[in-house]
Amino acid sequence: MAALTVGALGLGAVAVEGASAANPTGSAAGVPLTAGSLYNVVDQIGARSLWTQGHTGQGVNVAIIDTGVSPAAALSGADKVVAMVDLSGESGDPATRFLDTYGHGTHMAGIIAGRDPGANPALAAAHPEWFLGVAPGAGIVSVKVAGRNGAVDVSQVIAGIDWVVQHAAQLNIRVLNLSYGTDSTQPYTIDPLAFAVERAWKAGIVVVTAVGNDGKAARELSMPARDPYVIAVSAAEQKNKKWKVPAWASSGDTVRSPDLAAPGASIVSLRTPGSFADVEHPEGFVSPTLFKGSGSSQAAAVVSGAAAVLLSARPTLTPDQVKRLLTATANGKAITPRAVKFSGSGLLDVAKAATTATPQATQNWPMSTGLGSLEASRGSAHLLINGTVLQGEVTILGTPWNGASWAGASWAGASWAGASWAGASWAGASWAGASWAGASWAGASWAGASWAGASW
């Protein structure tokens, strides 16, 4: 496992055919509009009306713990990808450090905050050829935890959340997107991953999670969506102008169901040429710069963008208030069947949330102690590292996991699992010099991906 690598940078424009400040024909130029085009998604959730009022997510940074981000015009500019950290097994290789070799993280980043150079959100209704995410004014903090095949250990995700909490004030991180989940075999009240997301929530960060795509018979959300503090998002699919529960959607139970639903079927976002998803799923190809994917991952990214837009309009809202507004104003009649176990309070309506009075909202669920088993938190998702399965109470760093010691530590300056993240140096990097053709993927040997994508 490579040592932690951190980078902070203002990215210059990346030359991509079909999009430039001088000629904003856009990433989506010539691409037919579908229900999953972000041009339509922003209307489906009411975000465009907020854009015209100047609320585009500006002043809000969204952390994405995922597979990194790749060079794209819609993610260029000094105020777009404001920082990157690499906690993955690829961090030691300059050819892959920070970069998205799987294709998932870039797709999420585009949905949340992508923006073609020169595109003005206030005028975007007349320009369907522009690519704009839900919160085009927001910034992205990319925390890479997985490499070429998307596999990641739960201890890496916990470390990523730890890093986000430690740097939230410095980087103005108000939202955390976690399109990841495990089939943990223990209650959230002791699960270490649940403890981690609750600490982020209590630190003032709106945590948005994907519920999973295990089918309607699953009857249990993934972890950490199972934790009642966070915003658990399921996907909705538009067919013949009517919203349906996708066949692959996970179902909640009598204890915990999704909080709300958002568009999540065939969502068109940024493509990472040569990535695992791009190579293995050619059916997802839309254009040289765009790719489509389905899942609660995409739906969670839509809600993360909506949360950023809402916070740009009302920056004093707490995470509990953001959750209450988004769930209380969701359209409960939009999706059929109308079962709460599939779609929670209904389809996201951020425009209505933005105009609803600030609620008195304080969640008082039992909190996680984090004292449970790291192995149980993994569930069935295990990494294979150099031919050995990572299992038991051992972290990705090979150090023993002590839940009592970790849960009682002060995150502000404490070391995590024997490695000091706070002492890591920040280094500049230039995407323009990244070489994709020369990268070697043959050495990848991880298995057990848990990203909540139903299909590409």
Residues of each region from the PLM?
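Catalytic-core regions built around general acid/base machinery
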Residues: 189-207
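Subtilisin-like serine protease catalytic core
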Residues: 21-24, 38, 49-85, 91-155, ...
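Short acidic, glycine-rich surface-loop motifs adjacent to enzyme active sites
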Residues: 30-33, 161-187, 210-211, 300
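Protease zymogen maturation seam
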Residues: 14-61, 71-77, 242-247, 402, ...
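Glycine-rich, charge-decorated loop segments at or immediately adjacent to ligand/cofactor-binding or catalytic sites
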Residues: 213-229
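C-terminal subdomain of the subtilisin-like protease fold in secreted/lumenal serine endopeptidases
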Residues: 35-42, 123, 127, 131-132, ...
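Secretory targeting and sorting signals
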Residues: 1-21
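Extracellular S/T/G-rich loop segment that most often corresponds to the catalytic His/Ser-adjacent loop
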Residues: 66, 85, 225-308, 312, ...
